[in-house]
Curated annotation (Swiss-Prot):
Official protein name in the record: Putative ribose uptake protein RbsU
Membrane topology of the entry: Multi-pass membrane protein
Keyword Transmembrane carried by entry: yes
Main subcellular location of this protein, as a coarse class: membrane
Length: 293
């Protein structure tokens, strides 16, 4: 593993780590955030396709790629709604934990990962540690009824949103399409869902004409940059799938800390310390789930 590979592997740290913070900083409603983010991703995907000469896939590969992108957009809409309740610094560790659980369980029961009793025990213990780590990141010294209510609502929302993220990762596996080939149709699927969602919310304002929607395209560039660098990092001649995945998960640390310090989502010193320990537990346990043979 060389220096260039590590740099590329840390691309998702910056892209996915800053994406929720930038989206929250620009503000607006979830409809503005999802519309701008998906348009930004589509622009990035079109430029990449033109640069590399990648055309749209055909047949079921196209269908499943579109479904994949639609799943992500659904999950991200739900996540943006959770941001409104508890802030990105608290929502991101939870949704990351749920995504890790979803991906791991799918791998075990559908793809045959973690063969053998010992590996399964280690894997499920690691998943338990991930849940404990996520719980630590939302711990508060003062028990406020409104916060507890919002947190419960956010957790339920993020559980529902995990369905979309699972579709995003699982749908392309139904075909042999590569990540680069799927990137553009995934972005198209994202935009389709965002446009439908915007049309459904026209009574609350025209997201297509609101300035903040177009400002949010910048957040989409960050998401797309992360997705692209992850695809490159996961290639065998770079970091490989397992190491690339672990490096990409460091984004939850940046997303959480930038939410705390740049979005003024304040924590006490004790809460911050426990949050950091929780993040470390999530990263360590996530690494274990990937490297189980």
């Amino acid at each position: 593993m060389d220096f260039i590979a590590i740099l590329i592997g840390l691309g998702p740290l910056l892209g996915w780590g800053l994406f929720p913070t930038i989206a929250s900083k620009f503000g607006g409603r979830p409809v503005n955030q999802i519309f701008g983010a998906t348009v930004g991703t589509l622009i990035f995907a079109i430029v990449l396709a033109l640069f590399k000469g990648i055309g749209l896939p055909g047949g079921m590969a196209l269908v499943f790629s579109l479904i994949s992108g639609a799943g992500w957009a659904f999950g991200q809409i739900i996540t943006f709604k959770a941001f409104e309740l508890v802030g990105s610094s608290r929502a991101m560790p939870i949704t990351t934990a749920f995504q890790l659980l979803g991906a791991s369980l799918w791998g075990v029961f559908a793809l045959g990962n973690w063969p053998g009793i010992t590996n399964k025990i280690i894997g499920f213990l690691a998943l338990l540690v991930i849940l404990i780590g996520a719980r630590m990141t939302v711990w508060t010294e003062t028990k406020q009824q409104e916060y507890s209510k919002n947190l419960r609502s956010a957790v339920i929302l993020l559980l529902v949103g995990e369905i979309g993220y699972w579709i995003y990762s699982a749908a392309p596996q139904a075909t042999d399409i590569g990540g680069f080939k799927a990137f553009l149709p995934q972005a198209i699927g994202m935009v389709i869902v965002a446009v439908i969602y915007a049309l459904m919310n026209m009574s609350k304002g025209n997201a297509f004409k609101e300035k903040v929607s177009w400002q949010q395209t910048i957040s989409g560039f960050f998401f797309a940059f992360a997705a692209l660098t992850y695809l490159i990092s996961a290639q065998p001649n770079m970091n490989g799938l397992a190491t690339g995945f672990v490096l990409s998960q460091t984004s939850v640390v940046l997303a959480t800390l930038t939410g705390i310090f740049f979005l003024n989502q304040k924590k006490t010193s004790k809460e911050l310390m426990i949050t950091i320990v929780g993040l470390v537990l999530i990263l360590v346990a996530a690494s274990i789930t990937v490297f189980i043979k």
